[in-house]
């Protein structure tokens, strides 16, 4: 419950008190009795209803006249006595710093009362001060912050606080000020004693006495006390250099005095509050013993009232650093402790003597002393430039209040010479500090000696006369003052030009800055001061509106030079900041915290795109551990999700060739190609099953990876369309200039290749040698730096070789990989013909694309060396696969026997079989059981999936061939076999490579297909064209001998035996293969294979090259198919043996056909049996021209 108001205490505690004692009429007493009853009735009401009534009552405001409902008689009855009269009362706003309080003031002839108006129309006394302890002043800006109307305000204070009292009108303000000053002086005349001893302590001042006791009068101000104490302490200087502080027991910390306070009243008030004086003397003027003031020394230190003299520069620093001093009696919130800003003032570099000049001092010094060669100090110029730049865009500039502590801290920094970054300060703080600087110029910037002349300017006739008068007065000012005025009015003019947005017209600016520009030389009456203030405001308004005519047009360009310097400095700081971030681009924190719209994004364009540090901006960190290990290269199609599929086809070609020319590592062993992760591929060839893998293409790229050969023009083009996403993309997705040159050189080769193929289709001429020769020349010129990579496939790359893919692919994706035109594509399905024409017509029809993949894998191997090793290790055989190898060995031996039988009969593989097999090199390598030169089924560098067990088994199986040039010695470790095979293949000469094709083996096969193909009748025409595009070497005819001459006769015999073989194979039920990765059954594919087996046997089909399906996770494949291989092997073996037995009787009559048929059939059967889980199976028939088809 609230404490009782004074009138309630009086009336309630003394109900029989006579009204005559209060000095109030009985009528008033009756009214007070009614008031008492009303108050008591309110207290008896319930709390909710009372609160509701209070909420609905109108809150009093300063501008309102005293409410008639507020009855002051009861309140005054406790204050008025026989010798005390009420002079005036009214409402006013008391402001201290940023705090504003509405109070009701009562002025008696000897007492000043401040009361708070309560909502129940009662008063609560907040302060009761003797007039002899009070003071008044006009320094409104020193006490209050913000927009204070000096016309209606003045400073009012008592020990030891200062307030800005604002009244409803200037008349009210003048009336209150005159009454206060008059009765304060009257009460001071009654003081006794008129003077008291005052002890002054010197602090932070060297070479002076510690303390001195001086005698002060009751009318001496703080500045006058400073002037008296300086010589007694042995200090030279003026009161502006020092400040007087008060340390009393009532305050937690010393309080600085502005200069207009009365130390006499402060000490006497403290004595009365300390109960040193008699109780009767507190409210009276009874004299007391002169020795009693000296009893202050006997009090505890915390109760003593001490006056401390400090340098003025230290005074502000002490106030900032001392957290114990609470200006507004408010504690700092512990919640915001992280945002507390401590003072950065350095107090250790102070001069030892106060008389020596203080370096860096700025405030309170005349302009000629701080301006060297009439140039403004840098802090002042920086503030003016900042205000000129930000002020026109700030609403209420120079008018809105600023934080007092921030202003004092900035002022101290500027005054101490510390470099200050104004960008970190509020614009209002800077404006307030600038006004403070102008206010501290001795004699004002317009010179107080010319005050009367300045005020009389506005009395001139017209504007011309006023301007001439102003210019004559400016000539009388020091040059430094004129320079500052030119800059100052340039800023004010610029702000005034934008008054529509900042609401600061010339009049508003003049009202705010006039008190800081000109003031009278001596104090005068309030009436005169108000009149002079109005005239000065009108003068400043006139100067702002006519500054261009007074100071010249050039004041608008004064800040251009400063602006250029500042812009240069800002750019330098931005560049240093950007380089600092770049120097630590290996940090994951910088990568994670990087925003696409960061400030450095604009700076990137300024710096140009040639910087190597751009790679840290354009790559992703590999911190993302939850992403799959499938990696690849980014293409623009990954960014532009809105473009059509046709656009996607057109965009893929220029991007896919980027790594071919820029990502070359010459000293990496060739066998390392096989270590590439099986899922690495360009997104252009990713199938639907690998769509998710493509999305994480460059996700694991290290941010510290150097950028390699990217072009500024390409980077700028990409940034224009993919501004945000490109920052996280890899520069590998950019087409380099080398690719463009490569395409230009390739165009004539393409035309020549097409012409040759057309001729071959008409005449049947073998053009493979010419194509291989041209192809070899081109590869040597374009990729000679790759060393063994170039020598590996000279003259022997058939047309069907394309960029290897390491992810499961559909038939549609497989068809996209063909590097030749659709007219020469022997197995391109019709539904992909249109897609092939666009991106592939510009490539030479006989050009192998395996070299591109070699370079890509070489590049990827350099980046993912650790992950390749991990992938290779993960590609180890499971226990089931080891058993599978044992079964495979036995099948190899049996297959070899069948081959030997065919060799005994003298049947050689003809030219057609070699031609047919060479065209199948587009498919991934798989296990092959081939006659004679089966060594060529080894997985080619850069195309064999790392850790592929079946691909390695192909190498192991090929060692059994009698005529193989390269024979691995181990089959226990498929991975080792693959590497050994590749090491051997590096050393093969072109002749051996060509010989492998003629003898029926497809050279370095490219692991391309990812689905089990089946035969389609409608692709026979395409196969015919591809048959003639096979690369052959003349030396192969020498090795084959007579068998090569009999090759054409075998075709007719094979046709005759074809119907009979179909009947033999038809009863065989289709073997049920394991489910394919694509989820489509392969029964149809196997049925077609079995159906076509006799046909191929009759026609002398060459050994089939099968491809191992590439899988991104080898363990999944092995686990998925481990249960099916054995049953499938046995079924196919039985089929093979039965076919062999039916064909064998006819071998005696035919010199080569039946053994050849037997060899072919056995080769096909064992091949399928040994690799039941392999993805695609390609069976090529020259005569029937069957094409493999994905299921």
UniProtKB/Swiss-Prot annotation:
Give start-end positions of Basic and acidic residues composition bias.
1182-1191
- Biased composition range(s): Low complexity: 934-961
Q: Which Pfam families match?
A: RA, RHG20_PH, RhoGAP
**Hey, where's the site called Arginine finger on this chain?**
399
Task: Identify the residues that the record assigns to the PH domain, covering every copy.
Answer: 78-180
| Matching PROSITE patterns | RA (PS50200), RHOGAP (PS50238)
Question: Under the cellular component aspect of Gene Ontology, which terms does the record hold?
Answer: cytosol
Q: Which GO terms describe its molecular function?
A: GTPase activator activity
Q: Where is the Rho-GAP domain?
A: 365-551
Key word GTP-binding present:
no
One biological process term from GO is: regulation of Rho protein signal transduction
- Ras-associating domain boundaries: 194-295
**Region of interest: Disordered:** 1-45, 768-791, 926-1014, 1052-1123, 1140-1191
Q: Which residues carry this modification: Phosphoserine?
A: 46, 704, 730
SUPFAM superfamilies documented for this protein? GTPase activation domain, GAP, PH domain-like, Ubiquitin-like
Keyword Hydrolase: yes or no? no
Annotated InterPro entries: ARHGAP20-like_RhoGAP (IPR047886), ARHGAP20_PH (IPR047887), ARHGAP20_RA (IPR047888), PH-like_dom_sf (IPR011993), PH_domain (IPR001849), RA_dom (IPR000159), Rho_GTPase_activation_prot (IPR008936), RhoGAP_dom (IPR000198)
Tissue and organ expression note: Expressed predominantly in the brain. Lower expression is found in lymph nodes.
Q: What does this protein do?
A: GTPase activator for the Rho-type GTPases by converting them to an inactive GDP-bound state.
Disease in which the protein is involved: A chromosomal aberration involving ARHGAP20 may be a cause of B-cell chronic lymphocytic leukemia (B-CLL). Translocation t(X;11)(q21;q23) with BRWD3 does not result in fusion transcripts but disrupts both genes.
What is the name of this protein? Rho GTPase-activating protein 20
Q: Which organism is it from?
A: Homo sapiens
What gene is this protein a product of? ARHGAP20
